[in-house]
């Protein structure tokens, strides 16, 4: 991948997330492209609402919100875990799966609930979904969308020190380990976010750079 494909106006992009784990992963993925990702919290932008039933709608809402409040191009990710035995849950509610009204979000609580919900399930298949939305302006009529899917299965016992979210319970048969046991640089080559980014950049190459008005 080469930064030569990118419009100079995309050298500094606001990341529409306050999730430290996502910031680490995306910064590592975008650094080789010469793109500086600035978390929206550094620019005084609050988190956008995520009222939609699909990942793509939530990603677009967050990207437009960040661009509106900063005047910068914005990248948003909406991602989550979908479990076959749970009918696709936790899905778009992955980050707040076990959150109580007025309570804080907790990876540990989310994972504990997931394991309980699957206690009697024989089918442990699951997949991570990542939707990336890049808008050059708030009202960009042609946002760039990238989608990535990462298939695995849920295990009861957590393993691994890397990653975040459901990674310690997300087992990858082809790798022989959980996502949390992968070295970060390896995960960043094969994860759902890496796949979504590759697709987004392919679209950017195809459309060419578009100047901000």
From Swiss-Prot:
A GO cellular component entry from the record? cytosol
Q: Which reaction does it catalyse?
A: XTP + H2O = XMP + diphosphate + H(+); dITP + H2O = dIMP + diphosphate + H(+); ITP + H2O = IMP + diphosphate + H(+)
Is-annotated flag, keyword Lipoprotein? no
The positions flagged as active site in the entry are: 78
Where Mg(2+) binds, per the record, is at 78
**Some GO term, biological process aspect, for this entry: which one?**
nucleotide metabolic process
Record GO terms (molecular function): dITP diphosphatase activity; ITP diphosphatase activity; metal ion binding; nucleotide binding; ribonucleoside triphosphate phosphatase activity; XTP diphosphatase activity
Binding annotation for substrate: 17-22, 79, 164-167, 187, 192-193
UniProt cofactor note: Binds 1 Mg(2+) ion per subunit.
Q: Provide the E.C. number(s) assigned to this enzyme.
A: 3.6.1.66
Q: Which InterPro entries match?
A: dITP/XTP_pyrophosphatase, ITPase-like_fam, RdgB/HAM1
Q: Which UniProt keywords apply?
A: Hydrolase, Magnesium, Metal-binding, Nucleotide metabolism, Nucleotide-binding
Names of the cofactor(s): Mg(2+)
Give the top-rank taxon of the lineage listed in the UniProt record for this protein: Bacteria
- Which PANTHER family does the record cross-reference, listed alphabetically? INOSINE TRIPHOSPHATE PYROPHOSPHATASE, INOSINE TRIPHOSPHATE PYROPHOSPHATASE/HAM1 PROTEIN
Quaternary structure note: Homodimer.
Similarity annotation: Belongs to the HAM1 NTPase family.
Q: Per its database record, what is this protein's job?
A: Pyrophosphatase that catalyzes the hydrolysis of nucleoside triphosphates to their monophosphate derivatives, with a high preference for the non-canonical purine nucleotides XTP (xanthosine triphosphate), dITP (deoxyinosine triphosphate) and ITP. Seems to function as a house-cleaning enzyme that removes non-canonical purine nucleotides from the nucleotide pool, thus preventing their incorporation into DNA/RNA and avoiding chromosomal lesions.
What is the official name of this protein in its record?
dITP/XTP pyrophosphatase
Give the species this sequence originates from: Bordetella parapertussis (strain 12822 / ATCC BAA-587 / NCTC 13253)
Species lineage: Bacteria, Pseudomonadati, Pseudomonadota, Betaproteobacteria, Burkholderiales
